[in-house]
């Protein structure tokens, strides 16, 4: 069962809408769905909400330490409430997935993500869960640092938001400790939108919906 949901990002209005803050967008969306309010908590170096789901307390956390020091916040809360690494989900932006794509996995390397590196170091254990939200790649490694700190175009932001909505539909499975089912649900391809119906000009004959006899 996931007891701690962590969204990664950078604090401050100048970063709020940037790609690197996709994890914050996710925890904000979950807080709205659960009608919980994230509040500053100095003890955990971030914004925290305690919510009750299935009769059990669970926590939402947004570290306010800047991305590279996220582990300080996560480890402080996890140790105080005796939350094991396998009961933690960390949501973060992912360059190697396109906007609208996501991947859920447990453990593994930080793959160059500084927030994950610090969490892994502070917990002393890599076996926490990660939800990777695709933001796309600029195509040139030298441009990555600037790319993640820019706002995505509206179409990309909409794709990321739609991906977040789909992932939230699987949270109940995480609360029920059914991570394989949550993974299958998140990794399923989203349904294709139906093509728009043809627009008929005024006065034009309406095409038949069925072949005439």
From Swiss-Prot:
Subunit structure, as described in the record: Monomer.
Annotated source species: Leptothrix cholodnii (strain ATCC 51168 / LMG 8142 / SP-6)
Which GO terms of type biological process are on file? protein quality control for misfolded or incompletely synthesized proteins; rescue of stalled ribosome
Where in or outside the cell it occurs: the entry states:
Cytoplasm
- Ranges for the region named Disordered are 186-213
Site entry: Discriminates between blocked and unblocked aminoacyl-tRNA = 10
Name the encoding gene, please: pth
Q: Which domain of life is it from?
A: Bacteria
Main EC class of this protein? hydrolase
MF terms per GO, please? Answer: peptidyl-tRNA hydrolase activity; tRNA binding
Q: Where is the active site?
A: 20
Quote the protein name from its UniProt record: Peptidyl-tRNA hydrolase
* UniProt-annotated site: Stabilizes the basic form of H active site to accept a proton, residues: 93
Q: Where is the composition biased (Pro residues)?
A: 196-213
- Where, in this chain's numbering, is tRNA bound? 15, 66, 68, 114
| Role, per record | Hydrolyzes ribosome-free peptidyl-tRNAs (with 1 or more amino acids incorporated), which drop off the ribosome during protein synthesis, or as a result of ribosome stalling.
Cellular component aspect of the GO annotation: cytoplasm
- List keywords of the entry alphabetically: Cytoplasm, Hydrolase, RNA-binding, tRNA-binding
Q: Which reaction does it catalyse?
A: an N-acyl-L-alpha-aminoacyl-tRNA + H2O = an N-acyl-L-amino acid + a tRNA + H(+)
């Amino acid at each position: 069962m996931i007891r701690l949901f962590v969204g990664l990002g950078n604090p401050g209005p100048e970063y709020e809408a940037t790609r690197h803050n996709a994890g914050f967008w996710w925890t904000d969306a979950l807080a709205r769905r659960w009608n919980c309010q994230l509040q500053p908590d100095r003890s955990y170096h971030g914004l925290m909400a305690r919510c009750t789901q299935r009769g059990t307390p669970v926590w939402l956390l947004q570290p306010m330490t800047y991305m590279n020091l996220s582990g300080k916040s996560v480890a402080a809360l996890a140790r105080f409430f005796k939350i094991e690494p396998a009961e933690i989900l960390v949501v973060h932006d992912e360059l190697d997935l396109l906007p609208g794509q996501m991947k859920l996995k447990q453990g593994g390397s930080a793959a160059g993500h500084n927030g994950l590196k610090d969490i892994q170091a502070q917990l002393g254990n890599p076996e926490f869960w990660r939800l990777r939200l695709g933001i796309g790649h600029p195509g040139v490694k030298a441009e990555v640092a600037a790319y993640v700190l820019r706002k995505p175009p509206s179409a990309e932001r909409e794709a990321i938001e739609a991906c977040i909505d789909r992932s939230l539909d699987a949270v109940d499975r995480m609360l029920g400790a059914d991570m394989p089912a949550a993974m299958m649900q998140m990794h399923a391809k989203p349904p294709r939108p139906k093509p728009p119906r043809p627009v008929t000009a005024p006065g034009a004959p309406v095409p038949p919906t069925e072949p005439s006899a």
